[in-house]
């Protein structure tokens, strides 16, 4: 699964828990994960703590990712 780019539409508690698990188990590197959310400032903080890519909207996530999870 190392070559897959993963996207999240919504980056709340559930998405963050999934990302944390993926990163801890080294399933994917952070630079292959994209996320968007309604609150841009909060998204920047949370994606920054995981070092994943923040996206402005769902369209951008879909354009970047191979697989998208709606969380």
Q: What is the meaning of each model-derived region?
A:
Residues 1-64:
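NAD(P)+-binding Rossmann beta1-loop-alpha1 motif at the extreme N-terminus of oxidoreductases
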Residues 68-69:
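N-terminal Rossmann-like NAD(P) cofactor-binding module of classical short-chain dehydrogenase/reductase
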